[in-house]
Design a protein with these regions (language model features):
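Signature of extracytoplasmic/envelope-associated structural regions
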Residues: 2-119, 123-463
Length: 463
């Protein structure tokens, strides 16, 4: 008996790609490196609104309706944090870069030791930093020793020391290093910038692929808990959505034009948008792995026009959306591997979250069917921490009432090469709230993540 698939799409069959755009707003083709494994179902929608006619008649019924210019679409992409243990880009590199603005690659930054450092010292004084910045946390190499640090000393806006150092990191041996010894930052650092990349989002929902161009990342949220995988949730707003579904060839293609119908021999041309890619499933043809790009859609003729050689396409051939063959990046991190450093000390919390709101406003002008470019607005950065309410924590009430600032580092993962940290030099804590969880009192604390000078409120570090 032949195997058959249901006509209804399977909700557990999904894949996502997020691609940095070469030109903002111009749809970028996905590659295997852009693949994201969604955690649960990702969604993408752009729904036009309609305005009812204001004309009156001898009836209480609405007599007409007008379609409005389309607002920005929105994609929601839940995932687990996945890191490449060989040092390559993390899963969703494009989204993290688009949320922040720029990336400082490994080995770009060097410095010198200000004085001799002993094998047991947990502070490393530095000077003559060049090539970029030393973030609030990261991994450096001095001679043959790797050191992971979780704090830094800043004087007059200049980093003068790395603190809370874990010596002999990643299987190396702690050693004494002479003054003026060279130090190299081995971490990749995502940093804030006033100009950000835009992304194209591709989402495969079983038999149909939807895609959006000109995407601005507007929210990135990292959760902190003791169960499950390490959650990351990203929201993208985009300019224009397209789609590419399933159809069948009707008749013999004429040149690059294909008449497409559905399984009931009705026109299927509305299942396609320019920019999508198809493959011939019946004959296992995908343009040598590149897919056939749709360059035109003619609703009147019922045809789509594609790039590539299609002389082998024949009547009845099944056409499906093409996406690149892709493999996941690394393994998902466990949330129980997370840790937090509050004012240089290991913090004790039950759960929490770190939210990076990076809102943007899309321009809309008369004559434009779809939104124009996006203009960034003020960031909304915050952290929440829920802990058990111990006796020593009572002072948090008075301190929070007054408001106070502390540096915070959140680290996801514990193994070398499989760790991501988020460093914040200025977190202004507010008045906490006392709560109850079972037999224990709890304390909910919220902090606003602030900048000091320029774009320096927050750093994401792939250690």
């Amino acid at each position: 008996m032949a195997a058959t698939c249901p006509s209804v799409g399977k909700s557990n069959y999904q894949a996502v790609w997020a691609v940095l755009e070469d030109v903002n707003g111009v749809l970028q083709k996905p590659t295997a490196a852009d693949y994201i494994v969604p955690r649960g179902n990702a969604t993408m929608n752009q729904t036009p609104t309609n305005s009812a006619s204001e004309e009156l008649s001898e009836s209480l019924n609405v007599t007409d309706q007008f379609q409005d210019a389309v607002d920005a679409g929105e994609a929601s992409i839940p995932m687990y944090l996945r890191l490449d243990p060989s040092g390559g880009h993390m899963q969703a590199h494009a989204l993290i870069l688009a949320a922040m603005g720029k990336v400082q690659e490994r080995d770009a930054v060097t410095a010198s030791l200000t004085s001799e450092v002993g094998a047991e010292d947990d502070t490393i004084p530095v000077e003559d930093i060049s090539g970029g910045v030393l973030p609030p946390s990261g991994v450096v190499e001095v001679d043959t020793e790797k050191v992971r640090y979780s704090g830094r000393t800043i004087e007059d806006g200049v980093v003068t020391a790395l603190t809370n150092c874990e010596r002999g990191y990643a299987g190396t041996t702690a050693a004494t290093h002479e003054a003026a010894a060279s130090l190299t930052l081995k971490s990749r650092v995502y940093m804030q910038d006033t100009c950000r990349n835009r992304v194209s989002i591709w989402m495969k929902d079983d038999h149909t692929v939807t895609f959006g161009s000109g995407g601005a990342v507007t929210m990135t949220e990292f959760s902190m808990s003791n169960s499950g995988g390490q959650n990351v949730d990203v929201t993208v707003q985009f300019q224009r959505m397209g789609y590419c579904g399933r159809s069948f060839v009707s008749g013999t293609p004429s040149g690059q034009n294909i008449t497409v119908v559905d399984s009931k021999d009705r026109s299927a041309v509305k299942a396609y948008s320019v920019g999508g890619y198809i493959k011939n499933t019946t004959k296992n043809l995908d343009n040598s792995g590149a897919g056939y790009r749709i360059t035109a859609v003619d609703p009147v003729a019922g045809t789509i026009t594609v790039e590539g050689t299609i002389t082998s396409f024949a009547d009845g051939d099944q056409l499906d959306a093409w996406t690149p063959l892709s493999s996941p990046v690394g393994e998902p991190l466990e949330s129980r591997r997370a840790s937090i450093y509050i004012d240089g000390q290991v913090g004790r919390i039950r759960e929490g979250s770190l939210s990076m709101g990076t809102p943007a406003e899309f321009l809309q002008e008369i004559g434009d069917e779809y939104p124009g470019e996006a203009v960034d607005t003020k960031r909304e950065l915050s952290i929440t921490m829920n802990s058990f309410f111990r006796g020593d924590d009572a002072a948090e009430l008075g301190k929070g009432y007054d408001g106070y600032e502390i540096p915070v580092v959140v680290r996801f993962g514990k193994e070398a090469g499989k760790t991501l940290s988020i460093g914040m030099d200025r977190v202004k804590m507010s008045m906490p709230e006392i709560g109850v969880d079972g037999a224990s009192y709890t304390l909910d604390r919220t902090g606003a993540i602030l900048g000091a000078k320029g774009e320096d409120a927050l750093y994401i570090v792939q250690e």
